[in-house]
Amino acid sequence: MKLLSPLDQMFARMEAPRTPMHIGAFAVFDLPKGAPRRFIRDLYEAISQLAFLPFPFDSVIAGGASMAYWRQVQPDPSYHVRLSALPYPGTGRDLGALVERLHSTPLDMAKPLWELHLIEGLTGRQFAMYFKAHHCAVDGLGGVNLIKSWLTTDPEAPPGSGKPEPFGDDYDLASVLAAATTKRAVEGVSAVSELAGRLSSMVLGANSSVRAALTTPRTPFNTRVNRHRRLAVQVLKLPRLKAVAHATDCTVNDVILASVGGACRRYLQELGDLPTNTLTASVPVGFERDADTVNAASGFVAPLGTSIEDPVARLTTISASTTRGKAELLAMSPNALQHYSVFGLLPIAVGQKTGALGVIPPLFNFTVSNVVLSKDPLYLSGAKLDVIVPMSFLCDGYGLNVTLVGYTDKVVLGFLGCRDTLPHLQRLAQYTGAAFEELETAALP
């Protein structure tokens, strides 16, 4: 038996029909040369027969709200692994529409919290795979690592198959819960003590992430949402991002944040809704995880420089804030980071459950998260991975999410928005590309 961490429990409790709390990704593969007509169906049957998903994807949530735990079960492959088809010839637009519908549908919380869809019918000798899992069962980095475990750099290798980790039945549930309660209480006291000493200094001085959170303006991104999702995609070349980062002594992530900030500035100007205060983003930072921790990420709030017209000045402001924010988080112990994440998520979770989140002031405007899949090409049973697009979750007051994944020589940005409250989401993706080009022109000699 394994307990859900406080942060994992928070994500489970935030689940609601309008705001499903799963994250996911879809990937497009090139069929191998000479692949038979049954290739995709054979792949579907092979995946259905593999016990390739480790803990907690072989488990369901059990126990009460105060001490939830994972109970191991035998997943039904015919339920979790599905074969779908687009009307041939399926286009990228057709695939996007299907994935939007799949991502809008909540998971069944009474079953293991994941689904995998193989999708045939694409033109150009391609097929797609869509995977989603609840955020209480996986974070962004964990999800990418899981997908990576199915793939290989060897075009001839079969699908990866991890062996499930048995929990065993030889335990006394009452004793385990009692020990866990004591352990959590001790950890909580220790974390509060550490955080009390750090938070006072985090508020002071220039580039404070805490003060940035308290001055976040309300925008069209920060409204009540429904369950219907819209996806937009932008692809940036990694060598070009690195060149700008090197020339400005910043990180690639800073360059992307500045590009997204420039896009938001233009987007909101066109809507007549650009606030005086700069927009802010929640930027996750991973930390060391133990065997019982699924979500091992905290985060800080960084300005996006939407009040700054000059793209290089915008980047400089963002870099100063992210440098301080990352340093402050990395100086904390993993225990303190876990509780810091819970404290930061608590007002969002309470607002979500009470219905007040759409009207109370936001702590940030949206999240921008970044993970790396692989620098090398990857394959699934000989089918080369062409592109992977990440997709996160939304909740009331936070109707936009931007997730990045690095693969080979490109970075793919997935913009997830509420279909009915965020108009023209594709423009935001397009403007991000244009804002990067503007920054590149200004930064490089």
UniProtKB/Swiss-Prot annotation:
Keyword Acyltransferase attached: yes
Active site feature: H135 (proton acceptor)
Species name: Mycobacterium tuberculosis (strain ATCC 25618 / H37Rv)
Task performed by this protein: Catalyzes the terminal and only committed step in triacylglycerol synthesis by using diacylglycerol and fatty acyl CoA as substrates. Required for storage lipid synthesis. Upon expression in E.coli functions weakly as a triacylglycerol synthase, making triacylglycerol (TG) from diolein and long-chain fatty acyl-CoA. Has very weak wax synthase activity, incorporating palmityl alcohol into wax esters in the presence of palmitoyl-CoA.
Keyword Secreted: no
Any Gene Ontology biological process: response to hypoxia
GO MF entries: diacylglycerol O-acyltransferase activity; O-acyltransferase activity
Reaction catalysis annotation: an acyl-CoA + a 1,2-diacyl-sn-glycerol = a triacyl-sn-glycerol + CoA; di-(9Z)-octadecenoylglycerol + (9Z)-octadecenoyl-CoA = 1,2,3-tri-(9Z-octadecenoyl)-glycerol + CoA
Keywords attached to this entry: Acyltransferase, Glycerol metabolism, Lipid biosynthesis, Lipid metabolism, Transferase
Signal sequence interval, chain numbering: none
EC number: 2.3.1.20
Protein name: Putative diacyglycerol O-acyltransferase Rv2285
Origin superkingdom: Bacteria
